[in-house]
Amino acid sequence: MNIDPVALKIGLLEIRWYSLAYIIGILFAYWYVQKIDKYKVFTPESYKSIISWWVTGMILGGRIGYILFYNLNFYMSFPIEMFKLWKGGMSFHGASLGLFCTMYIFCKKYKIKFLSAIDLCLCAVPVGIFLGRIANFINGELYGKVTNTRFGMIFQNSGDFFYRHPSQLYEAFFEGLLLFVVMNLLFFFTKVKSYQGMLFTIFMIWYGIVRFFIEFVREPDVQVGYILFNWITMGQLLSFIMVILGICILRLSRMSHNI
């Protein structure tokens, strides 16, 4: 499989699929959150600046997370490389933490209920995850392990001609499309949204479990490899922590019904 990672080129300007995924995902979230915000969780004034807060949280968190979790030694040796975002290197877990922090500050600033805001936003986030994984697939990165199944594909970036799991597509479906359906079914057809933070915990647990198991068929990052027992990757460790935190918050939420 070999698809040009550049979606559009105008003179010296190159627009990559990965950049388009971010842009479309953010614009969709902005539109969708306003559409489903029937109880006016966000104020009209807050909507004017929310995109800048999202972008700041995702970029800072995603980049810092990647540096700390996946390639710290390299960036300590070549610190200027930290700022070369166009070369890639973002972490979902880092971006999630960055968004969590910026949204907390944002909600304090505009006097918005934090967990209600997070619940609302997470109804749209899976679409961004879906688009991001499709971009990973187009770029031929984050491919899976060698397989003999009929789902196998050849990724030129792997440096060999073995058939491999298209793990990006597995993630696009289970972490993206299916999670979007689940989150919105719960939001529209159950009383879950009445309990602040409940959708947040469901998102954390779902994503963490799915990511943990898909990592078994995904090739580990070459610069990190396995970090525990020769079969646990960094992505699995972070996802496991995500699940544990989600379960803990869920228990607190059920006890208090209002975090």
Swiss-Prot record:
Membrane topology qualifier: Multi-pass membrane protein
Entry GO MF terms: phosphatidylglycerol-prolipoprotein diacylglyceryl transferase activity
Residue stretches spanning the membrane: 10-30, 50-70, 86-106, 112-132, 169-189, 197-217, 227-247
InterPro entries assigned to the protein according to its UniProt record, in alphabetical order: Lgt
BP GO annotations: lipoprotein biosynthetic process
Enzyme Commission code(s) on record: 2.5.1.145
Coiled coil: none
Subcellular location: Cell inner membrane
Pfam family, any one: LGT
Binding residues for a 1,2-diacyl-sn-glycero-3-phospho-(1'-sn-glycerol): 133
Pathway assignment: Protein modification; lipoprotein biosynthesis (diacylglyceryl transfer)
Keyword annotations: Cell inner membrane, Cell membrane, Membrane, Transferase, Transmembrane, Transmembrane helix
Any one annotated GO CC term: plasma membrane
Function recorded in the entry: Catalyzes the transfer of the diacylglyceryl group from phosphatidylglycerol to the sulfhydryl group of the N-terminal cysteine of a prolipoprotein, the first step in the formation of mature lipoproteins.
UniProt-listed HAMAP family: Lgt
Family from the record: Belongs to the Lgt family.
Protein name: Phosphatidylglycerol--prolipoprotein diacylglyceryl transferase
Source organism (scientific name): Ehrlichia ruminantium (strain Gardel)
Gene: lgt
